[in-house]
Amino acid sequence: LTAPDAGRGIGTEHTETFGGPGDTFRILHVSTGNVCRSPITERLTRHALADRLGHVVPGGCAEGDAIGGLIVESAGTWGHEGAPMEANAETVLADFGADPTGFVGRELLDEHVIRADLVLTATRDHRAQVISMGHSAGLRTFTLKEFTRLVRAIDPATLPPLDEGVVERARALVRAAAALRGWLL
């Protein structure tokens, strides 16, 4: 076995683990190529969060920009590293008023899963791939459809109030969704 190339595998520059103390919460969207589905869900999530939290960022939010402490990213299990978003995905985003500019495809790496507080996948196969990477990802990895269904069943009054911070509320939401898994039909 050899050590991974720089920029590959487990990163050394970021030591904070998922769900740990910190003022950011990372959402990772995963699909196959990271040129269509996951870029769409990433950018729509950023757009909705910026709208909901009242953050106006000229030119949109770039990858890694925090919106109220929330960082939204994406990667692909067979990611087209460095590839642009597909044209039809850009059209979908434009139709919803979201910014498609500046996107660059990424291959899913261990460090992405390690740093993510919430992983949302396009399919159950993607979820299985993320979980098989290890890193205690099972309780924070959901298909987008599954997470949506679970979140709709959570009473917002059971979550920390927004004045305690968006990040704490997001962490509590993921814990509540994980706890509901297997209980809802």
Regions found by a protein language model. Give the residues of each.
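Conserved active-site segments centered on acidic
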Residues: 2-116, 125-128, 132, 136-139
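Phosphate-binding/catalytic loops
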Residues: 2-5, 17-19, 131-185
